Amino acid sequence: MTVNNILWFRHGLRLHDNPSLLEALRNDGTGSESVRLYPIFIFDGESAGTKLVGFNRMKFLLESLADLDRQLREIGGQLYVFKGNAVNVMRRLFEELNIRKLCFEQDCEPIWKARDDAIQNLCRMMDVKCVEKVSHTLWDPQQIIRTNGGIPPLTYQMFLHTVDIIGKPPRPVAAPSFEFVEFGSIPSILAQEVKLQQVRNLSPEDFGIYYEGNPDISHQQWMGGETKALECLGHRLKQEEEAFLGGYFLPTQAKPEFLVPPTSMSAALRFGCLSVRMFYWCVHDLYEKVQANNQYRNPGGQHITGQLIWREYFYTMSVHNPHYAEMEANPICLNIPWYEPKDDSLDRWKEGRTGFPMIDAAMRQLLAEGWLHHILRNITATFLTRGALWISWEAGVQHFLKYLLDADWSVCAGNWMWVSSSAFEKLLDSSSCTSPIALARRLDPKGEYVRRYLPELKNLPTLYVHEPWKAPLDVQKECGCIVGRDYPAPMIDLAAASRANANTMNSIRQKLMERGGSTPPHCRPSDVEEIRNFFWLPEDVVADC
């Protein structure tokens, strides 16, 4: 007898370390039953972040699905990709294919709860076993909350203490064996009804999504898929090993470079092309290997994968908070009276037309590539919110969620709340603020990054490339870049705006403190060092704001 099981891919777009895949390959019977597997993905307008998605994100997703399809075809199967409401598609598959079991990876964020509750209800109604497995996070966020007494840990140090009680995250599960698995096929009439797609032929344009970057900019190309992710992991581990041998860790933060091919694994983690548990354990095992050959062992702990732990923290903080990416209904977010722009201020920030080269280069890189270094994300977010324009972080979240390859709801919103001093910060303490001009001089001393993404400034002398408005008019004419015509003049007096915003923050803070008990349960960092590590704040790029 053969049982029919569905493996529903959502975010975990991989075959390695995939507990839900292993579950789908189990027959749950007497042992004489074989398994017929149907691997599927559903374009329902929301799953995998497709509710708000730009060209590069959709391209990365389609490449990831095509890579899965290619791998499955090599072993006799394929990835069935459908378009439509997930419940409606599943109901027809259950009815026509006599499905015994549905398996999928847990999507812990509350934005997926209604979808998954509806699917689980359908499974109960149609007597289909529904199995959900945790593998998109290192730990189960629900277990973290239970261990912390039923509430999320309100500081990062509390989070570290809680997961220390739980213990180290599970190691990756075994590789799947398809030796005794049959892959099912979809009847043609059903395929037409549930809008079966040929994923190998899909492009962002098929979804009405078009490239918005400057095609003349020379930019990095990112490629989605498990195959590419595992290849990149090998390169990244070499970089990690060099850092460990050199006595430091987090190499992409310790020595940030904006022009070299990026080695970040975050996009692959966001779409689940790479298992976060595999990445975590590869780095930690490598560290132990390097340390075993050292005469004096250096403590590493969770710090060597600090960004992965922050990812877990933000996931945990969001899991019971459906308003996590909003301000007013969000219990952990301070309600700051942000400016509601009636002019083109927000559009100028989005399009890279602020008149501040480092900000503009970053925003144009985002449109061109779907990527920004962690430092550039922080500085552009600070500029939009408390550092300059005083526009709500909610607008920034929506823009980043649409265009950043690796943006997911929890981490993206958490970062924006922190940077804007709305949460995860000392109560409205706006003292730690990066100067985009000082940071540009520090990290792009020759202006190479700015010139790549702002070709109109390519001929300006290095002396003026980060402050083109200071170039004499004859220099501007000679370089073919007149400020105010070929490149915008600064849209604001940055120093004055920063001071005014800091004063406003202090005033709001004072009123909140005077109210005492009405102050929201505001999450905040454990110490000053945590702030500097999060923002990457050398002394010489901190502005007086």
Curated annotation (Swiss-Prot):
Pfam families assigned: DNA_photolyase, FAD_binding_7
Organism (species): Aedes aegypti (Yellowfever mosquito)
Subunit structure: Interacts with tim and per; promoted by light conditions.
Residues that coordinate or bind FAD: 236, 264, 266, 307, 374, 406-408, 412, 415
Record's comment describing the protein's domains: FAD-binding region regulates cry stability, cry-tim interaction, and circadian photosensitivity. Photolyase/cryptochrome alpha/beta domain is sufficient for light detection and phototransduction.
Protein name, UniProt field: Cryptochrome-1
InterPro entries: Crypto/Photolyase_FAD-like_sf, Crypto/Photolyase_N_sf, Cryptochr/Photolyase_FAD-bd, Cryptochrome/DNA_photolyase_1, DNA_photolyase_1_CS_C, DNA_photolyase_N, Rossmann-like_a/b/a_fold
Domain Photolyase/cryptochrome alpha/beta intervals: 3-138
Record localization: Cytoplasm; Cytoplasm, Perinuclear region; Nucleus
This protein's GO CC annotations: cytoplasm; nucleus; perinuclear region of cytoplasm
